[in-house]
Amino acid sequence: MRKTGGEPCAEIVERAPWFHNLHLPDGTQTAPEHPLGDFPAFKWAAIAPHIPDELHGWRVLDVGCNAGFYSIELARRGARVTAVDIDPHYLDQARWAARQCSVHDAITFRQQPVYALAHEPASYDLVWFMGVFYHLRYPTLALDILRRKTRKLMMFQSLTMPGDDVLTPPGNLPIDARERMLESGWPRMAFIEQRLADDPTNWWAPNHACVEAMLRASGFRVRARPDHECYLCEPHGVTPVPYDEELRAAVNLSPD
């Protein structure tokens, strides 16, 4: 948490701890000793070539914006960004950082959970859904909600189980053939009852096959995998009507 010359920056220190290492215009970094390295800049470096350089006229939703790294980068490309998070600490960091980067007029910050988006009429050209899915108690509900909000693209990222094998399940698995679910590449998701990385909100770890299957089941198609655990998706098809009714009941949403 220091400027290039090594002097600490009081405004950064008073907002610590930081999970995003932001590179501010004056040379300041917010978390230069981050255990993951220059995070999330190294993720952005891999993803950025897959996102249009010109985002003027695009509306973007950043779900779980944290300190605002991605919101700031997308605003720099011309997007109007709505950035939501449930943690006021992160939102304070993000608002401050957006001002330092002179993009605060392009970003609207709100404190709210992902599920509350179901009650809003707005939709977005790009939905940014990174680092949130596995923290949710009801992850597929969130995917179903965000499918309704996505017009063009969604960037999805989740903590995952190791392995990239994909087994395509049969269209109808007989009940006495469930041993196939133990095969490598079967879509599965581990439930984390206790802690992972000392975080009590790390609930889930899907494997790669499960991520792709859940995205398909929610009405997305994977266009690219720009980085480890990252999936660039586009809306595709529709989800079955019974699940639409279930979503409405889960979030107390009135029929259209």
Task: Label every PLM stretch briefly.
Residues T28-F39:
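Class I SAM-dependent methyltransferase Rossmann-like catalytic core
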Residues V114-A116, Y124, W128-F129, R137-P255:
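S-adenosyl-L-methionine-dependent methyltransferase catalytic module, highlighting the catalytic core
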Residues G68-I72:
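Glycine-rich SAM-binding Motif I of class I
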Residues E73, R77-Q111:
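Class I SAM-dependent methyltransferase SAM/SAH-binding core
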Residues M1-T30:
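N-terminal, positively charged/glycine-rich alpha-helical extensions of SAM-dependent methyltransferases
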Residues G37-H56:
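Conserved alpha-helix/loop element of class I SAM-dependent methyltransferases that forms part
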